[in-house]
Regions:
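Conserved, structured core segments of small domains
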Residues: 1-123
């Protein structure tokens, strides 16, 4: 039985864009994970200036266009893995971080979170 994990890549709002060499290294790793049946999906996100934030507070919904200057860190990318254990998801995350060594000078953090199973149909 496998479990799905989402890895959430956190970086600074003003982080540099990845170099072509880094994109190539990440793509190669994603292809390797896909060949092994571990990778479901992965991708990078545009800066928050291209996005919006929706919030529910006190029964009211507000939407704010980016950028979000108050954010110290933002989500820069994600990956979804279908693996046998949290340890395997962490191993793929380590490989992802290792791919950045020498190609990314800024701090990077990746959160590994197990995804909930979808509810059964007809419930």
């Amino acid at each position: 039985m496998t479990m799905r994990f989402m890895t959430i890549v956190k970086t600074r709002e003003n982080a540099e864009q990845p170099s072509p060499a880094l994109i190539q290294a990440i793509t190669k790793l994603g292809e390797e994970a896909a060949k092994q049946g571990a990778m479901v999906e992965f991708g990078g996100l545009l800066p928050t200036a291209a996005g919006a934030r929706a919030r529910l507070a006190n029964g009211k919904i507000t939407v704010t266009d980016g950028p979000f200057s108050e954010a110290k860190e933002v989500i820069g990318g994600f990956a979804v893995y279908d693996v046998a254990s949290k340890q395997e998801a962490i191993a793929w995350t380590r490989k992802f971080l290792e791919a950045h060594i020498g190609l990314w000078k800024q701090e990077l953090e990746v959160e590994v979170r197990q995804m909930m199973d979808a509810p059964a149909q007809g419930c």
